[in-house]
């Protein structure tokens, strides 16, 4: 046991001898999270920072400036140990401006005018022109007012909601760490100027073009946003790094050579606009609905024209019929109401600390069926505490702790949770703490997700060069084994301890070191725990009731992951990600790999590629998948997922790739946002069903009335019906919508089926009203007591159409969900106005009795009940859904063969890459 003896000797050389028993006694209690501890740790880090031996950067060399507006070479010769002074920063900012692209400020006039553009708006504008041609100035004015009203409401609501989101987005602004006045300072990215000495490290989004000036620097930089190249590019001293690139590995200093529009990206406007806030699938849905409704309008007009020509109607009469059908057949408020609903929803989510990067994320989050969640910080507290260490025979725990802390970051900003836990635990290791600051760090290599280790080369007070390593226990053990054989009893005891810690839910970190040119020494294992958040188990149960399946993806060992999953109630089907066999190995057929992923509760020891593959497999099985992440290596899977979620504290790269950025910690924030997104989606869905049914209602009724009886409803009343339909439902964006207990999607066949049937029932109710007024005494028939046909029909149409929204907005019977006061008030106001129209005979002359009005209200309520019963039956009918849409077919043999083929190709491709 030569290595043990050496370790013991080393301990004696650096520490006064302390018995392991005493050391263990002091470390058993968990560490409290108190402010004074954080202050003590910050003071220690500041002391360590002042001795940063690993930031030994050299003066930069002359090189080509990186911008369309060249920066003189003399401005790029900044002292790399002192940086710029405040006066130099001010002068350069005055000359070169802020480090930001010149944004084309959105022209508010053009933005407002955009609400008059679109297929539906064009039809209404054509209707206005037609009304002007008929010299029907009342209809012309009302149609124009309707277009203007929808534009104003949509513009104001979206502007207000956008302002709320923009305010919170400012908190996500990129930061930069620069060397100024001899000190590292964090500034906003736009404040960087040419000649600044910029510090970059893993996870940094580079804010401006620059050239690396650190000797022996090694960075891996993701330039996919610029070049489209998926693999990271290696960078060394003298190489240029471009703005918007992400550092995936390493750390270095660089001198800024170009900022703002003078950067490589700034000279390519198309790249600047690459990250547009798309509106997603719902825009396609609206366009499709608008197109179908236009086709139905045209078909109805053909019927009307044929019947009119057959009766030799005048051209003016035909144009009046055309105008009536056009106005009622196209829902002019549809785009504005849906966009407003989404924008208001985004603002509401922002208040709940969920920043929506693009509106389409709301829709996709509402439909998510599987959430692939990382463990640390989302399911757990991300507050590690250390337990009693396992030391190899002859090793002092103080020695183990000192080595582990030497292999830790010495920067206050960006220090990870593991290093923070070790530094906090130094209060239990006074001797290690007392000598830690006497060591000078020569090299520091941050955590490498491939080797799963972090290492540092330090210089001891005695001048000895020591290499310290901590990381995944088996990876550290492998490092020692590659240097020299480890005695079987030590190897066995070490591995057994790793397994024991894992079964107890501890995450283990192996610690080893090498003195000078000597052999590697294995020192022991430090167990740490990251307990589940207090609300995680409850939230997971709630997620299950919402039809959401959660799969845990973690880099921890299988035992730890399985124990954590068991504690949280996720299940124990947690496997090593290598079993996927997508890394060039494995014999499982492709279809079985897909089944395996589908059935698993989670995967452990995952690499970024595993996360990407899991998301891809689930998507190919037809699931909508959300993925959480926080690191730069999570960016590919965040982009691949239907909804990429950057959790609290995520790196700039992860935030840039995500669809939604959370400022609040934990799974509960995500589930709250999911419920809210389902509410928003439900509002949109309810309004779309409602609005299609209204259009079909009057197309069917007026088409039949004109074709059979050669007459139509008064044009002014038709226009007011269209106005009332839109005004009443503008408040849908603020409705107390219920959220679905299952993931929601645009089931368009079922949506159209329900809308058509509701439209037919509405048309039948209106036809009954019409026909009962055509019989009986000269004062009217069964429904009408006395008065005119047009006002009575107007009231019946207005009431039944307005009340329909109370039916479509509910997830069950219409009485199961109470609407908001805004929606109820808007509907009531419109009903009162429609009633006054009828009583006083506005626009058509002739009054209608109160008795007739009461009869219409009673009859309309009867229609409302029939509609409510029909919608409730259709909504929950699997048979109707199968008839209209059909369920997804079961995976057939052809599908499984394709999956086998795809996985085989992936394995062959990976094996080829390894062999080459």
Swiss-Prot record:
Superkingdom, taxonomy of origin: Eukaryota
Biased composition (Basic and acidic residues): 14-31
Task performed by this protein: The plasma membrane ATPase of plants and fungi is a hydrogen ion pump. The proton gradient it generates drives the active transport of nutrients by H(+)-symport. The resulting external acidification and/or internal alkinization may mediate growth responses.
Example GO molecular function: metal ion binding
TM stretches of this protein: 112-134, 137-155, 280-305, 321-350, 712-734, 755-776, 818-843, 848-874
Cytoplasmic-facing ranges: 1-111, 156-279, 351-711, 777-817, 875-916
Top-tier EC class: translocase
Record-stated family: Belongs to the cation transport ATPase (P-type) (TC 3.A.3) family. Type IIIA subfamily.
Entry-linked Pfam families: Cation_ATPase_N (PF00690), E1-E2_ATPase (PF00122), Hydrolase (PF00702)
E.C. numbers: 7.1.2.1
GO annotation (BP), single: proton export across plasma membrane
UniProt source species: Ajellomyces capsulatus
Gene Ontology CC terms, in alphabetical order: plasma membrane
Protein location: Cell membrane
Ranges for region Disordered: 1-82
Binding positions (Mg(2+)): 630, 634
Keyword entries, A-Z: ATP-binding, Cell membrane, Hydrogen ion transport, Ion transport, Magnesium, Membrane, Metal-binding, Nucleotide-binding, Phosphoprotein, Translocase, Transmembrane, Transmembrane helix, Transport
Biased composition annotated in UniProt, kind: Low complexity: 1-13
Active site residues according to the UniProt entry: 374 (4-aspartylphosphate intermediate)
Extracellular side: 135-136, 306-320, 735-754, 844-847
Compositional bias per record (Acidic residues), positions renumbered to this chain: 32-50
Matches recorded under InterPro entries: ATPase_P-typ_cation-transptr_N (IPR004014), ATPase_P-typ_cyto_dom_N (IPR023299), ATPase_P-typ_P_site (IPR018303), ATPase_P-typ_TM_dom_sf (IPR023298), ATPase_P-typ_transduc_dom_A_sf (IPR008250), HAD-like_sf (IPR036412), HAD_sf (IPR023214), P-type_ATPase_IIIA (IPR006534)
Membrane topology: Multi-pass membrane protein
Gene name tied to this protein: PMA1
The protein's name in its UniProt record: Plasma membrane ATPase
């Amino acid at each position: 046991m030569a290595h043990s003896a050496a370790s013991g000797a080393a301990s004696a050389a650096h520490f006064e001898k302390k018995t392991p028993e005493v050391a263990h006694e002091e470390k058993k209690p968990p560490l409290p999270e108190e402010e004074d501890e954080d202050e003590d740790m910050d003071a220690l880090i500041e002391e360590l920072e002042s001795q940063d031996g690993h930031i030994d950067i050299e003066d930069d060399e002359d090189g080509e400036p990186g911008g369309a507006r060249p920066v003189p070479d003399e401005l790029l010769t900044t002292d790399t140990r002192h940086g710029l002074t405040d006066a130099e920063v001010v002068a350069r900012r005055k000359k070169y401006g802020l480090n930001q692209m010149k944004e084309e400020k959105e022209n508010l006039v053009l933005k407002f005018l955009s609400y008059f553009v679109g297929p539906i708006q064009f039809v209404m504008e054509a209707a206005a022109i037609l009304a002007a041609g008929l010299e029907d100035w009342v209809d012309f004015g009302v149609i124009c007012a309707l277009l203007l009203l929808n534009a104003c409401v949509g513009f104001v609501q979206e502007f207000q909601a956008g302002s709320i989101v923009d305010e919170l987005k400012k908190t996500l602004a990129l930061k930069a760490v620069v060397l100024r006045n001899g000190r590292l300072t964090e500034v906003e990215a736009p404040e960087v100027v040419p000649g600044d000495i910029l510090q970059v490290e893993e996870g940094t989004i580079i804010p401006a073009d620059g050239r690396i000036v650190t000797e022996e620097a090694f960075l891996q930089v993701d330039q996919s946003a610029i070049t489209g190249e998926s693999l990271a590019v290696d960078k060394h001293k003298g190489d240029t790094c471009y703005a918007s690139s992400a550092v995936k590995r390493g750390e270095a200093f660089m001198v800024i050579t170009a900022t703002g529009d003078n950067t490589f990206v700034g000279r390519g406007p198309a790249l600047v606009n690459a990250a547009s806030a798309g509106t997603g699938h719902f825009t396609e849905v609206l366009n499709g609905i608008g197109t179908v409704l236009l086709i139905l309008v045209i078909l109805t007009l053909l019927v009307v024209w044929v019947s009119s020509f057959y009766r030799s109607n005048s051209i003016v009469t035909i144009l009046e019929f055309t105008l009536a059908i056009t106005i009622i057949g196209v829902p002019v408020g549809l785009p504005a109401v849906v966009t407003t609903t989404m924008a208001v929803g985004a603002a509401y989510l922002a208040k709940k600390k969920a920043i929506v990067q693009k509106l389409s994320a709301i829709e996709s989050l509402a439909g998510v069926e599987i959430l692939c969640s990382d463990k640390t910080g989302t399911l757990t507290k991300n507050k590690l505490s250390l337990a009693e260490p396992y030391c190899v025979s002859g090793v002092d725990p103080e020695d183990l702790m000192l080595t582990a802390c030497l292999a830790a970051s010495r920067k206050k900003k960006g220090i990870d949770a593991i290093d923070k836990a070790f530094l906090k635990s130094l209060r239990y290791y006074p001797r290690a703490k007392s000598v830690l600051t006497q060591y000078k760090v020569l090299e520091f290599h941050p955590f490498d997700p491939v080797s799963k280790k972090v290492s540092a080369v330090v210089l001891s007070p005695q001048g000895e060069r020591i290499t310290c390593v901590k990381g995944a226990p088996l990876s550290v053990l492998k490092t020692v084994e590659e240097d020299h054989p480890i005695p079987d009893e030590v190897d066995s005891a070490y591995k057994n301890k790793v397994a024991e810690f894992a079964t107890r839910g501890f995450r283990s970190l192996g610690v080893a070191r090498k003195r000078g040119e000597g052999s590697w020494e294995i020192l022991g294992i430090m167990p740490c725990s990251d307990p589940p958040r207090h609300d995680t188990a409850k939230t997971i149960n709630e997620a299950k009731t919402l039809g959401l399946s959660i799969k845990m993806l973690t880099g921890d060992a299988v035992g730890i992951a399985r124990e954590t999953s068991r504690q949280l109630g996720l299940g124990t089907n947690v496997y090593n990600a290598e079993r996927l066999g997508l890394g060039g190995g494995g014999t499982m057929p492709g279809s079985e790999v897909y089944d395996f992923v589908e059935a698993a509760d989670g995967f452990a020891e995952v690499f970024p590629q595993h996360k990407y593959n899991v998301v891809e497999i689930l998507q190919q099985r037809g699931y909508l998948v959300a993925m959480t992440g926080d690191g730069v290596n999570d960016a590919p899977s965040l982009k691949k997922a239907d909804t990429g979620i950057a959790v609290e504290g995520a790196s700039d790269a992860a935030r840039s790739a995500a669809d939604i950025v959370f400022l609040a910690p934990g799974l509960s924030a995500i589930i709250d946002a999911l419920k809210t997104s389902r509410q928003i989606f439900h509002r949109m869905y309810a309004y779309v069903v409602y609005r299609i049914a209204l259009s079909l209602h009057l197309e069917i009724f007026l088409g039949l009335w004109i074709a059979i009886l050669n007459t139509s409803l008064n044009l002014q009343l038709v226009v007011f019906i269209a106005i009332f339909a839109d005004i009443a439902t503008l408040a849908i964006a603020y409705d107390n919508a219920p959220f679905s207990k299952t993931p929601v999607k645009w089931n368009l066949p079922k949506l159209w089926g329900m809308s058509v049937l509701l439209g037919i029932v509405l048309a039948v109710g209106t036809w009954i009203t019409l026909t009962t007024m055509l019989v009986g005494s000269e004062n009217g028939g069964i429904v009408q007591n006395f008065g005119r046909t047009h006002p009575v029909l107007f009231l019946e149409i207005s009431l039944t159409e307005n009340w329909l929204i109370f039916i479509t907005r509910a997830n069950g019977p219409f009485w199961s969900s109470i609407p908001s006061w805004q929606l109820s008030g808007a509907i009531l106001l419109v009903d009162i106005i429609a009633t006054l129209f009828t009583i006083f005979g506005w626009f058509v002359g002739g009054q209608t009795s109160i008795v007739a009005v009461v009869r219409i209200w009673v009859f309309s309520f009867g229609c409302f009940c029939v509609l409510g019963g029909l919608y409730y039956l259709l909504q929950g009918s699997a048979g109707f859904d199968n008839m209209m849409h059909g369920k997804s077919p079961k995976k057939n043999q052809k599908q499984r063969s394709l999956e086998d083929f795809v996985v085989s190709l992936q394995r062959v491709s990976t094996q080829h890459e390894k062999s080459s």
